[in-house]
Amino acid sequence: MTMPIIMIIGVVFFLLIALIAVFITKYRTAGPDEALIVTGSYLGNKNVHVDEGGNRIKIVRGGGTFVLPVFQQAEPLSLLSSKLDVSTPEVYTEQGVPVMADGTAIIKIGGSIGEIATAAEQFLGKSKDDREQEAREVLEGHLRSILGSMTVEEIYKNREKFSQEVQRVASQDLAKMGLVIVSFTIKDVRDKNGYLESLGKPRIAQVKRDADIATAEADKETRIKRAEADKDAKKSELERATEIAEAEKINQLKMAEFRREQDTAKANADQAYDLETARARQQVTEQEMQVKIIERQKQIELEEKEILRRERQYDSEVKKKADADRYSVEQSAAAEKAKQLAEADAKKYSIEAMAKAEAEKVRIDGLAKAEAEKAKGETEAEVIRLKGLAEAEAKEKIAAAFEQYGQAAIFDMIVKMLPEYAKQAAAPLSNIDKITVVDTGGSGESSGANKVTSYATNLMSSLQESLKASSGIDVKEMLENFSGKGNVKQSINELTNEIKEAKTIQKSE
C-alpha cells in the first residue's frame, strides 16, 4: 500500500514540475521598445484588436502574458525608430527646371493598438531593412510629386513649407502601413544648370553690399568710438599728468621750504656758535695779552732794578778812571742791549698778536665777519698801543742813558754809526762794474793806479768834514775830549752831577 502512495506522490510531483516548466517557458514579456503580438484562440478581451474582417490579435506592451501551448503563438514587433535618407534624381519643377533634392526622415511604428496591429499585419515576419525600404520608396515618390508641383523659387525660398508638404502627403500613405513620420527635413536642393546659383547671386550681392555697408558703418562707429576713447584717454592722461605735476610742484615747494628753514636754522646755529667761539677766543686773546703785558711790565721793572744796581756799582767805582771808562762802555752796551731787547720784544709781541688776530679773522670770516673785524681792530689798536709803549720806553731809556752818560753815550753811538755812514757814502763806488786806468808815465801819487786808490782814502778823510757839515758833530773834537786832551776832570764831574740829578728825578717820580 505504501508503494502506490509513493508512486502517486511522485507522479503528482512530476506533473507539478512539468507544469511549472511549461509555465516558465510559455510566459512571454515585452520590453519598452517592442510589442508582443499574440495570435490564436482564447485571447480574451484585454488588449485585443479586431479588424474589419473579424480577425483578432492580442497586443502586449510593457508587460507579459502566458502563451497557451498549441493554442497560441507570440511574435515580438520592434517599435524603434528608423532613419531614412531619401533622394531624387532630376525632377522637373512646375517651371520645367530640373532639380534634385535630398532629405532625411525619421519613421517608427505608431503607438496605438490599431497602428501596431496594422504594422504587424504589414511587417510581421519581415526584416527591418525591408520595412525601411518600403517606407523610403513611399517618401521618395511623394518627394518627386511635391517637387513637380512647386516652383524653384518656392522650393529655394521656403524649404520649411516644402518639408511640411512632403510630410503631410506621405503621412497618409505611411499611416496605412502603421508608420508615422517623426520628422522630415530637406538637406539639399540643387541643379546641374546653375539655376539656383543664379537665383542666389542678386541676394548674395545684396547681402554682400549690405554686409559691406554694415561693415563700413561698424568701422566708422568703431573709429569714432576709438577716437573718442583715445581723446578721453589722452584727456584723462593729461589731467592725471597735470595733477601729478601739480602734486610734485607742491611737494618740491614744501621740500624747498623745509630745506630753507633747516638751512636758516643751521646757519643761525652756526653763526651763534661761531660768534660765541669768536667771543671766547677774543677773551682768551685779551687775557693772554694782559698776561704778556704784565710779564713785560715785570721785565721792565727788573730791567729798571738792574739799571739801579749798575748805577750803585758805578757810584762805588766812579772815582777810578779806568773803572769809570769801563762802566761807561758797559752801561752804553747795556742801554743798547736793553733798547734792542725792548724793540725785539715789542716786534715779537706785535707779530704774535697780529698773527693771532689774522688767524682769528680767517676762522670766523663769513657769518662772524663783523665780530672778527671788531676783534682785529681792537687787537691792532692794542698792538699799536704796546708798540708805542715799547718805543716810548726805548726812547725813554735812550734819553735816560744820554742824561746819565752824556757825551760818552753819544760818542759810543756815533762810533757804531760811522761804519754804516761810510758804507752808504761809498755805495756809488760799488756800482762801478769796470775801471780802465790810463797811465801817462807819471810817477808817485800822480800815477794812474795810485790815483785810483787815493779816491777811497780821500773819501774817508773827507768823511769827518761831511759829517760835521751835515749834522754839526765834530768827531775829532769828541775823540780829543774823550782821550784826555780836553778837560777830562771837568767832564767827569759834570757826568757825575748829571747822574745824581737823574737819580733824584727818578726817585721823585
UniProtKB/Swiss-Prot annotation:
Annotated stretches, region: Required for correct localization: 203-509
SUPFAM superfamilies linked: Band 7/SPFH domain
GO molecular function terms noted in the UniProt entry: protease binding
Keyword check for Transmembrane: no
Region span, PHB domain: 119-301
Record topological domains on the Cytoplasmic side: 1-3, 25-509
Region (Not required for correct localization): 485-509
Subunit structure: Homooligomerizes. Oligomerizes in very large complexes in vitro. Interacts with FloA, FtsH, FtsX, OppA, SdhA and SecY in detergent-resistant membrane (DRM) fractions. Interacts with FtsH at midcell. Interacts with FloA. Interacts in vivo with KinC, FloA, FtsH and ResE. Interacts with ResE, colocalizes with ResE in FloT-only membrane rafts. Another study shows nearly complete colocalization with NfeD2, but only minor colocalization with FtsH or KinC.
Protein name: Flotillin-like protein FloT
Organism: Bacillus subtilis (strain 168)
